[in-house]
A protein has these predicted regions:
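Cys-dependent protein tyrosine phosphatase-like superfamily
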Residues: 14-125, 138-226
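Conserved lysine of the Walker
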Residues: 135
């Protein structure tokens, strides 16, 4: 009799432990550091990173009422396709900065960060790609590190564990973040440089354009008059 009671209690205890596991897992999933981007709308993978910056997957016309409610003034896409297909709202600026995480360099990140900062000066900003995970996730992580001063570790934790998408999407972005020279990026961003390297294509183009605009002296005009 005692053995039977003991076995029954043991079974009940095991059942209770198993029954609590999903609830505990759900609670752990819902526990989110307050400094991480906070969910706004799951259907669009829409999160708020700061009072003036949001991130999402590719929106559509159905998202417009929500974007208007959030007072979004600029939408930045990292896709090669224009947002004009779904966004033509007067007063909302469209910015297109296509890039790929497997071919990203410092000039791509600086261009994106600069666009975000310039747009934030005018009001709330939404940045997005197709799924809102890899391209958007990389820019978000670099914004955290370069602009907001987060550590790489903290930014990568948010990128990979924040619930923005499948982890296999992040490998190229993680590689870039780990190798990025944050001090050089921060200096280039502050100075208005297009890249951290003077040998980057955009830097060479800028140098060629600057030399082309230098006024040339007329050798005859330089001669002393008699």
């Amino acid at each position: 009799m005692l053995k039977l009671c003991f076995r029954s209690l043991l079974c009940l205890a095991l059942f209770a432990a198993v029954a609590q596991t999903p609830a505990q897992a759900a609670e752990a999933t819902e526990t989110r550091p307050p400094e991480w981007a906070q969910p706004v709308e799951k259907d669009y993978n829409l999160y708020q990173m700061s009072p003036t910056l949001y991130r999402s997957s590719l929106p559509d016309g159905g998202a417009l009422p929500l974007l208007m409610k959030l007072k979004i003034g600029t939408v930045i896409t990292f896709l090669p396709e224009s947002d004009a297909r779904w966004l033509s709202t007067p007063g909302v600026e469209r910015v297109q900065l296509p890039y790929r995480t497997n071919h990203v360099d410092d000039s791509d990140i600086l261009r994106a960060l600069r666009a975000v900062q310039e747009a934030e000066a005018k009001g709330p900003v939404l940045m997005h790609c197709k799924h809102g995970s890899d391209r958007t996730g990389l820019v978000a992580a670099m914004y955290r590190v370069v602009v907001q001063g987060w550590s790489k570790e903290d930014a990568l934790n948010e990128m990979t564990e924040g619930g923005f998408g499948d982890s296999h999407h992040f490998k190229d972005g993680v590689r870039y973040v780990m190798q990025a020279d944050v001090d050089k990026l921060r200096t280039a961003l502050a100075n208005g440089d297009c890249s951290t390297s003077v040998f980057a294509l955009c830097s060479l183009k800028s140098w060629v354009n600057s030399t082309a605009t230098i006024p040339r002296l007329d050798p005859q005009a330089a001669l002393p008059q008699r």
